[in-house]
UniProtKB/Swiss-Prot annotation:
<dbReference type="Pfam" id="PF16123">
    <property type="entry name" value="HAGH_C"/>
</dbReference>
<comment type="similarity">
    <text>Belongs to the metallo-beta-lactamase superfamily. Glyoxalase II family.</text>
</comment>
<dbReference type="GO" id="GO:0046872">
    <property type="term" value="F:metal ion binding"/>
</dbReference>
<feature type="binding site">
    <location>
        <position position="58"/>
    </location>
    <ligand>
        <name>Zn(2+) 2</name>
    </ligand>
</feature>
<keyword id="KW-0862">Zinc</keyword>
<comment type="pathway">
    <text>Secondary metabolite metabolism; methylglyoxal degradation; (R)-lactate from methylglyoxal: step 2/2.</text>
</comment>
<feature type="binding site">
    <location>
        <position position="53"/>
    </location>
    <ligand>
        <name>Zn(2+) 1</name>
    </ligand>
</feature>
<feature type="binding site">
    <location>
        <position position="57"/>
    </location>
    <ligand>
        <name>Zn(2+) 2</name>
    </ligand>
</feature>
<dbReference type="InterPro" id="IPR035680">
    <property type="entry name" value="Clx_II_MBL"/>
</dbReference>
<dbReference type="InterPro" id="IPR032282">
    <property type="entry name" value="HAGH_C"/>
</dbReference>
<keyword id="KW-0378">Hydrolase</keyword>
<dbReference type="Pfam" id="PF00753">
    <property type="entry name" value="Lactamase_B"/>
</dbReference>
<dbReference type="GO" id="GO:0019243">
    <property type="term" value="P:methylglyoxal catabolic process to D-lactate via S-lactoyl-glutathione"/>
</dbReference>
<feature type="binding site">
    <location>
        <position position="111"/>
    </location>
    <ligand>
        <name>Zn(2+) 1</name>
    </ligand>
</feature>
<feature type="binding site">
    <location>
        <position position="55"/>
    </location>
    <ligand>
        <name>Zn(2+) 1</name>
    </ligand>
</feature>
<feature type="binding site">
    <location>
        <position position="128"/>
    </location>
    <ligand>
        <name>Zn(2+) 2</name>
    </ligand>
</feature>
<dbReference type="InterPro" id="IPR036866">
    <property type="entry name" value="RibonucZ/Hydroxyglut_hydro"/>
</dbReference>
Amino acid sequence: MFEIIPILAFEDNYIWLLHQHGHALVVDPGDAHPVLEILDARGLQLRAILVTHHHQDHTGGVEELIQATSAQVFAPAKEQFSFPHHPVTAGDRLDIPGIALSLSVLDVPGHTVGHVAYYGDGMLFSGDTLFGAGCGRLFEGTPGQMYSSLQQLAQLPVNTRVYCGHEYTERNLAFALSLEPHHEALLSRREATAALRAQGLPSLPSSMALELATNPFLRCHEPGIIAASKSAATDPVSVFAAIREMRNHF
């Protein structure tokens, strides 16, 4: 078995560190220093760095980690990076040296045009595509692209554990409840999330089952979300675009 450690960076970023038998990988290291501290404290050898997209808060620590370790870097083929890396795209499989784990690469454009996610062994590292009770802003992609990406992730097994790039769950739940104030699953999740955060614990990982039940961006076909969106068109992409715009100003 392996252990997954959430490393908080900046205000609300998560760098995910997975290790087994002294070998480790990290996902989206925006800052090298907290990663190096844990590697040193636990006597771990960093073998791989996985990048989901090009934003600085997810890549800022990569070059320093390359210099400090022998780690290989895997990053989206459709995006540009200044550091050496192995470009990855949909369908690629990554076998991490020293760790009994094989990950599949999923293309999930929307937040950025080349964004990828990594899935394997019941785990999804979703970057800034899927959040707890939310999804990423559309900085580069279209509503149709992001909706399609989210629907792709929604097809994963319901027991998939979801490791997101940011601690946004409480704010996302507040927005979701502004759409559906009396939704029992949302109210229950808000209570559970508040209890975790009050203890200084992450609200993550989530699960795909929980997201399917409470994430409005995965429920754009449901009558309650359609009504709350006030969208003139009721197809799921139009509803998604409407509530994503509402979330931008929430």
